[in-house]
Amino acid sequence: MVGLSRLRGGGLLLVLALLPLALDGKPLEEAPTAPSRIIPFSRPVRKQSQAVLDPMVHPERPAGSGDDGDSRRLEGLAKEALGDGCFGQRIDRICNVSGMGCNHVRTDPAPTALARIIPFSRPVRKESRAALDRMQQPG
């Protein structure tokens, strides 16, 4: 390996400039400039222009789907379901598993440690089984 002392000056810059080419085999794409990011939002957009811009702005949305992502277009149950989570987004995994999400509702309480351990601690007689079942499932 070439020592860093030999790469002083322009040598280190040359290595850094050629590093992306060595890794990918092609240069990195240039990031869009600030004016090119601002121009589409600086003036009103006609429907013809919107059809051209939409696939560029939202590539995951199929062309001609009619869905502009606006919640005002939703009606009935679909609109009600939008407000079930944090900021209008459903967070089922966080809410149901850990209880840390928004609008958390737990229907059944978690069994206590004692109720989880007792069935495995010793053989149970029929009389004891009825008492254990009442402890594990009150009501």
Swiss-Prot record:
Source organism, top-level taxon: Eukaryota
Pfam families assigned to the protein according to its UniProt record, in alphabetical order: ANP
Region of interest: Disordered: 45-72
UniProt xrefs under InterPro entries: C_natriurtcpep (IPR002406), Natr_peptide (IPR000663), Natr_peptide_CS (IPR030480)
UniProt keyword Signal, yes or no: yes
Tissue specificity as recorded in UniProt: Expressed by the venom gland.
Signal peptide as annotated in the record: 1-25
One of the GO BP terms on file: vasodilation
Pro-sequence residue ranges: 26-75, 117-139
Family to which the UniProt record says this protein belongs: Belongs to the natriuretic peptide family.
Function: Snake venom natriuretic peptide that dose-dependently induces the rapid relaxation of rat aortic strips phenylephrine-precontracted. Acts by stimulating cGMP production in a dose-dependent manner (by probably activating NPR1 and/or NPR2). May also show potent hypotensive effects. A synthetic peptide (AA 77-108, where the Cys-95 is replaced by a Ser) increases sodium excretion and urinary volume in rat kidneys.
Name the record gives this protein: Natriuretic peptide Mc-NP
